[in-house]
From Swiss-Prot:
Source species taxonomy: Bacteria, Bacillati, Bacillota, Bacilli, Bacillales
Cellular component GO terms, alphabetical: cytosol
Cellular localization per UniProt: Cytoplasm
BP GO terms, sorted: thiamine biosynthetic process; thiamine diphosphate biosynthetic process; thiazole biosynthetic process; tRNA 4-thiouridine biosynthesis
Pathway: Cofactor biosynthesis; thiamine diphosphate biosynthesis
Name of the molecule in the record: Probable tRNA sulfurtransferase
Length: 400
């Protein structure tokens, strides 16, 4: 007898009511995509659960992949046995004996299939007695056991587990539409992308690159961050915008204290064009209320004016230390702090407006035509597709 399955439990997906099926189907697709390189592994779903059939594979590498799949609340290595009292006894004893350091245990039986003749409470007592009779130096503790042997009796078979691994929860990536992440290369925006994915959002990303003021290493840093994010979702397209000429024009032609605000508005205009082309429904940013000049309520109000797209700001109420802790936990922090400039850290005004007025911005913009340079910028966009294994180049065509 061996552990031959991984039992997957849903989180808030179980509360989705009539449309739960579409969430479960998407979760199954995402799981299959993450573990497709393991030969013979199969993913099956049943009422309220999903199972991965190991088919001779070691469970640990597969578990490491599954722990980062949004939509999974928890998982357990499981033994599958026939729905007979003797088989269930044997499986429960095997599961308990695998926990060599346990001094106390409890048994929890859940009888999903009422075709099984013994009620759950009675089966609890039968199994508890059997385990006590066939082990040494271990006692029952129903309140704080070292190990809980869980038995799920289903129509097709019984599944027995002896431990639970907490996962990331959330919703399966792809169930909440697609969003364009403004990815700078700093600490905040990758965390914003991660948190958006946790709510089921499928990401594409846009990066504003200003060579020679920003280097090729700065661009590669963004691609590396994107590759880290693919561990938690699907492949991600990154749209790299050649921003130098437009950025220089903004800082040359606009009042210095309003240049940062106008630059952000241009970023949103370009991002909106990509959203239209790629059928993306929203923008996601790493903005955090009150952190820097462009992230005051007044600045957001003025910058938002140029787009009708919803703007998702997952970090809006987090403090910097909280954001740093998440970035460390998800593996983006060390890349984010590499000392390469991005377009938002060059040409920084001495005293940027923290309370920019819409009417002033519109007045300044109306006195200079940025359209030719903006169209040239859009035509020069490069797109790369990032997976968790490779970087694939492709040209960005037909944007206009």
């Amino acid at each position: 007898m061996n552990y031959d399955h991984i039992l997957i439990r849903y989180g808030e997906m179980a509360l989705k009511g009539k449309n739960i099926k579409q969430f479960i189907i998407k979760l199954q697709e995402n799981i299959q995509q993450k573990i497709k390189h393991f030969e013979g592994v199969k993913v099956k779903r049943t009422q309220g659960r999903m199972f991965v059939l190991l088919n001779g594979n070691e469970p640990e590498p597969i578990i490491e992949k599954l722990k980062n799949v949004f939509g999974i609340h928890s998982l357990s290595i499981a033994i599958r046995v026939e729905n007979t009292e003797e088989q269930i006894k044997e499986g429960a004893l095997y599961a308990l004996k695998r926990e060599a350091n346990a001094k106390t245990f409890k048994v929890t039986v859940k009888r999903i299939s009422k075709d099984f003749p013994i009620p759950s409470q009675q089966m609890n007592q039968i199994l508890g007695g059997h385990l006590l009779a066939n082990t040494n130096d271990i006692t029952v503790n129903v309140h704080e056991p070292d190990v809980e042997v869980r038995v799920e009796i289903r129509k097709e078979a019984t599944y027995i587990t002896s431990g639970t691994i907490r996962c990331r929860g959330g919703l399966p990536v792809g169930t909440s539409g697609k969003s364009l992440l403004l990815l700078s290369g700093g600490i905040d925006s990758p965390v914003a992308g991660f948190l958006a994915m946790k709510r089921g959002v499928q990401l594409e990303a846009i990066h504003f690159h200003s060579p020679p003021f920003t280097s090729e290493r700065a661009k590669q840093k963004v691609l590396d961050l994107t590759q880290t994010l693919t561990k938690y979702g699907k492949s991600i397209k990154v749209h790299i915008v050649p921003f130098t000429k437009l950025q220089q024009e903004i800082f040359r032609e606009m009042p210095n204290d309003y240049a940062m605000t106008i630059m952000r508005r241009m970023m949103f205009r370009i991002s909106e064009r990509i959203c239209e082309q790629e059928e993306i429904l929203s923008l996601t940013t790493g903005e955090n209320l009150g952190q820097v000049a462009s992230q005051t309520m007044q600045s957001m109000h003025t910058i938002n004016e140029v787009t009708n797209y919803p703007i998702i700001r997952p970090l809006i109420s987090m403090d910097k230390q909280e954001v740093i802790e998440v970035s460390q936990e998800i593996g983006t922090y060390e890349t984010s702090i590499q000392p390469y400039e991005d377009c938002c850290t060059i040409f920084v005004p001495k005293s940027p407006k923290t309370k920019p007025k819409r009417e002033k911005v519109n007045y300044y913009e109306s006195h200079h035509d940025f359209t030719p340079t903006m169209e040239e910028t859009i035509n020069g966009i490069e797109t790369v597709k990032i997976t968790d294994k490779t970087v694939i180049d492709q040209s960005f065509k037909d944007l206009l």
